[in-house]
Amino acid sequence: MAVGNFHTIDASRGVKVLLTDEPGDIEICADDNLIEYVRVGIDGGELKITVAPRIHAVPSEQILVRVPYNGNIRKLEASSAAKIVAKTLFTGRMLEIEASSAARIRVDAQVETCEIDASSSAKVVAQIDADRLEADASSASSILLQGAVQKAVFEASSAASIDARKLVAHFCEAEASSAADIRVYCEQALQSRTSSAGSVSYAGPCSVNSADTSGGSTRGAANNELK
């Protein structure tokens, strides 16, 4: 399938999408009994990759779709156990990442602004270099971050986690609630808000302004937590 003009990739229903720097067309790899049910198409600037509804269960990673990076992608969406793995570096002004319902996204980016949202047991692993990063994790999802940003804004709830110990942030705002956990490395100033057994742990030479209620906690990280 020829590569068209799209700015968003939307993957769902257990498919695995591999973004590469290699030129060429979109390539679908699947067993003969599945390939006819793979749906790949562009609608309103979105490249949608899924499986026909008549297939009730898709075996894990049995469908692989290789997509050449076109330089225009600004949003990645994965849901329903789909996976997006980027083997290319995203650059530009903005990148949005959304993962839900046990989906997985892995990406590296050098952008001005990055927004990450993970929910319902999804996982995002990202190397981010940006001026501003916003990350929101909920409902047992997880976000694992590396890189460097000028300002980071984190929010985690309902047993979700954000691990940013290997992300150097100059300024950071972190809010954790309902047994969620946020771990950060901050160099200048941290504002922390916790409630309902949420926790924020921090490392780095930052000043800390915290507001903890209903069993929430803000604390400096122990040495073994920095690894």
What is the role of each PLM region?
Residues 155-156, 161-192:
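Glycine/small-residue-rich hydrophobic helix-like segments
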Residues 17, 84-85, 105, 124, ...:
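Short loop/beta submotifs within extracellular cysteine-rich repeat domains
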Residues 120, 139, 166, 184, ...:
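Low-complexity, compositionally biased segments
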Residues 12-13, 79-80, 100-101, 119-120, ...:
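Ser/Thr/Pro-rich low-complexity tandem-repeat tracts
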Residues 1-100, 106-115, 125-134, 146-153, ...:
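Acidic (Asp/Glu) and glycine-rich low-complexity loops/linkers
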